[in-house]
Structures are given as structure tokens and as C-alpha cells.
Amino acid sequence: MADSKRTGLGEDGAKATYDRLTNDRRAYETRAENCAQYTIPSLFPKESDNESTDYTTPWQAVGARGLNNLASKLMLALFPMQSWMKLTISEYEAKQLVGDPDGLAKVDEGLSMVERIIMNYIESNSYRVTLFECLKQLIVAGNALLYLPEPEGSYNPMKLYRLSSYVVQRDAYGNVLQIVTRDQIAFGALPEDVRSAVEKSGGEKKMDEMVDVYTHVYLDEESGDYLKYEEVEDVEIDGSDATYPTDAMPYIPVRMVRIDGESYGRSYCEEYLGDLRSLENLQEAIVKMSMISAKVIGLVNPAGITQPRRLTKAQTGDFVPGRREDIDFLQLEKQADFTVAKAVSDQIEARLSYAFMLNSAVQRTGERVTAEEIRYVASELEDTLGGVYSILSQELQLPLVRVLLKQLQATSQIPELPKEAVEPTISTGLEAIGRGQDLDKLERCISAWAALAPMQGDPDINLAVIKLRIANAIGIDTSGILLTDEQKQALMMQDAAQTGVENAAAAGGAGVGALATSSPEAMQGAAAKAGLNAT
């Protein structure tokens, strides 16, 4: 349906590109299926699975519990309820406003308003639900693709693609070259003109027949922008093409662990797959042996006088003729083997509990958690996960903010912001508590400064330098807070002038009072000379 043939990365078409890049993705799919097998199998089903598939439950629950626990803590640290991102002006613009603290405060107030609008948009469109599912996919499969639709209407939730539903190709630096997604949709749900074009090229189809819709986004060499179009049954859909700047592409491929030179990432579970598989086998053996051991079987001497029929019919307290030596119960006598298996299983479970952070119980269950609890979780995540924060901040949080800025500016929901002057910054880890952390920093800084009051009279201490170092250590920008030397001199001169005026007024008032008391006639003459009517 397209009038002109595409060139560059879009030359082969969406379906052909998808089929070609699927071979590179297959190894990552296999690893994701193995990881899901020992955690939550339904998170990454096999290609042959469908809605009616009854997944085999793992013999151990450490994998599933650890996955949900780690995803919840990542969600709390990366996307807290407070603002987890900040809009700041560039360093050059900030230096221009250093001499105008009021102007700098107004700019910061305006940027805070934009932040609140973005956060409200995220909450009202249920982004957190999809983001939590995305984090679970990253832990199991290591890859996920987010799509942020254009703000049309009052509800625009984002869409998540599993690794099995898209392909991606990157350059040597990790930049996205092209992405192809596959959506399955009923033929009757397509627009009428699209159905007509598909039937014209491929024959009639039933209305409930499922067809594949491919969306191809690729980098254009000439313009440097991303071009997008959709394709059904090798037919390009008219009106589906779009152009996106490189910093505002609504298709965001996210990786959990980045490997240099690879288009896809590795999962967190993959790093501990050996322990997960070993624990699964040990738990299966222990459970089966426990079931066998729990089966009670009595043995009776066939040559003895004790009759099993009488024993089974006897009630509690009855007397049955027989000999104790004729009866014995079957035992496996495998306690030593059980002890070894249990010890190894406990060691593996302890390692996995540390890896998935199952040992931390400081976070209570409730609707509201304190900033100290969030700070503890973020600190523990930083110690355990290492560089995961840096990857997610660059591949998930920062692109998300940039896309939302572009989309909300295009729909006039936020004012136009100059790209060269406004820079979005992402807060992760201990800084992910957002604007509430700013208030906490200010309170800590003021408390530390207040503790310096007893040192005012010490001639050996430079309090101005100490105050500045305290602010820098906490992370407070002192522009507009601490007075400069010029501002101090201006205030001192203003205070001196005000004091001089007050002293002169007091002295003049005292002189007039004395004159009026000593000589009323002289007071009247002075008043008449000044043009005043003395009464």
C-alpha cells in the first residue's frame, strides 16, 4: 500500500526482517525458558504453549519467591511514589542566574510543576503495573520492550512486549538500529481498508482468523531519525508511518545485564541458574523420599501366632492375643543420606536467599512505608546488584522521561522546554526517594549548621568554610542560600545606614523634647519657621 519503496534497513520489509533476526534471538529465548522453569514458568512460556497450558510447578518455591521479592524491591527503589526524576537547567543557564536567586527559585518552581505533571500522568495511566511486569521479565529473560502510545484520550497505558514478540538489532556501541514487533490480532479487528488490501493480495480470510501485524522501527541513515511503519501479510498499511527523533522513540528496549557487542541482554536468574537447578533436583529427591518414608507398612511374621486381621479390627485399648516379636514396621534407614541432602539444600537456599535478598525483613507490610525503609532497601540493592542501576537508569528511566517530555509537549500538557537548557536527570539508589529526599537534605544541613552555634567565638575556626563543606557533603547547592562577600557587605552597609537614621531620629526627637520643655516660645518660633502650626 506504500507508494514508494523503502531503502536502507527498511528495504526487506518488516516480516522478512523479523524472520531473519529471529535466529539471533533463539539462544536468549532458550535461556529465558530455562530460567522460568525454575521460578515462574508462566512468565516466559514456550512457543507451543497457549492459554490452556498447565505448567509444571517447581519442586521448590525459592525461585518464585525470590523473583517476586527482587522485582518488588527494584520497583520500590527505581519507581517510588515520590518523584524519581528531576528536571534541571544546564550549568551555563544556572551560572547566568547565580546573581538572581529569586529568578533561579522561580525556574526551579516551574520545573517542579512539570515533574508533578509527568508523575500524575504516569499514575493516571497505570504505568506502574506494566513497569512491574517489565522488571519481572528482566529478571527472568533479561530483555523486554516497552511501547508508550501517543497521549490520545484520557487513558493511555503502555504496552509490554516479551522477548518472544520482538527482535532488536544494535550497533557496536549498543545504539538501536532497528526493532520489529509482532502482534497477533483478529482479522475482523483491522480497519476495513486494511482488510480489503490484505484480501486483495492474499485471498479471503475469516473474521476470527488471527493475523500477524508487524511494526518496523529503523534508523534512517540520511536524516538520523527513526522511521516506523506497520505491515500485515506483506502489505504495508497506509497512514501507519511515523518519524521519531533519536531521543524520543516510544519503543524502549530494556536489558537487565548488558554484554558488550550483543543486541540482547542477559537475565539476573541466568547468573544463578546452577544453584536453582541444583536446588530443584535436591528438593525433588527430598520430597519424594519423604513421601516414601511417610508411608507406614507393618510386617507380620507368617509363622507367628499374631493375626493381622485382629490387629486391624482392634480398637484403642483392646487386648489382642499375639507376640511383639511377630510384628515390625518397614523403615528405609536412609537418615544419613537425608542429612547430607538436607545440608546441601540448606546451603544452596541460603545462597539464593542472599542473591534474591530474601533475608531482609526490615520492610513491613503496609500501604505506607517510611523513607528510612526505602533508603535501607535501596542501599541493600546497591550493594547486591552493583551495576544494574546504571543500566536501568540509562535504558529504562531516562528514555521513559524523554519520551514523556516530548509527547506531553506535543499535546500542550506541559510548556515547551528548550532542549539545550533543560536536562532530565534520573535518581536511582539512595537518591531515588525523589523530592522528599531534597527536604530531608535541607533539614539535615540546617541541623548541622545549627550545631555550629557554640563555635561562633572560636578564633581558630572558619565557620563559613565548615558550612560550605557540610552542604557539599550532603549534596546541597548553596547558590542563593549562603550569602556572598558582596551581599554581606551590602547588608552591613544597609544596616549601618538604617542604624544611623534611627540614631539621628532618636537624637533629634530628644533635642526637640528638651527645647519644648525648656522654652515653649522658642519651640513655637522654630515650628513657625519650619512652616508648621504649633498648637
UniProtKB/Swiss-Prot annotation:
InterPro entries named in the record: Connector_podovirus (IPR020991), Portal_prot_Caudovirale (IPR038995)
Superkingdom per UniProt: Viruses
Chief subcellular location: virion
GO cellular component entries: viral portal complex
Localization annotation: Virion
Pfam families: Head-tail_con
Example of a GO biological process term: viral DNA genome packaging
Keywords in alphabetical order: Capsid protein, Viral capsid assembly, Viral genome ejection through host cell envelope, Viral genome packaging, Viral penetration into host cytoplasm, Viral release from host cell, Viral short tail ejection system, Virion, Virus entry into host cell
Family membership: Belongs to the podoviridae portal protein family.
Job of this protein: Forms the portal vertex of the capsid. This portal plays critical roles in head assembly, genome packaging, neck/tail attachment, and genome ejection. The portal protein multimerizes as a single ring-shaped homododecamer arranged around a central channel.
Subunit structure: Homododecamer. Interacts with major capsid protein. Interacts with the tail tube proteins gp11 and gp12. Interacts with the terminase large subunit. Interacts with the internal virion protein gp14.
Identification of the protein by name: Portal protein
UniProt source species: Enterobacteria phage T3 (Bacteriophage T3)
Organism phylogeny: Viruses, Duplodnaviria, Heunggongvirae, Uroviricota, Caudoviricetes
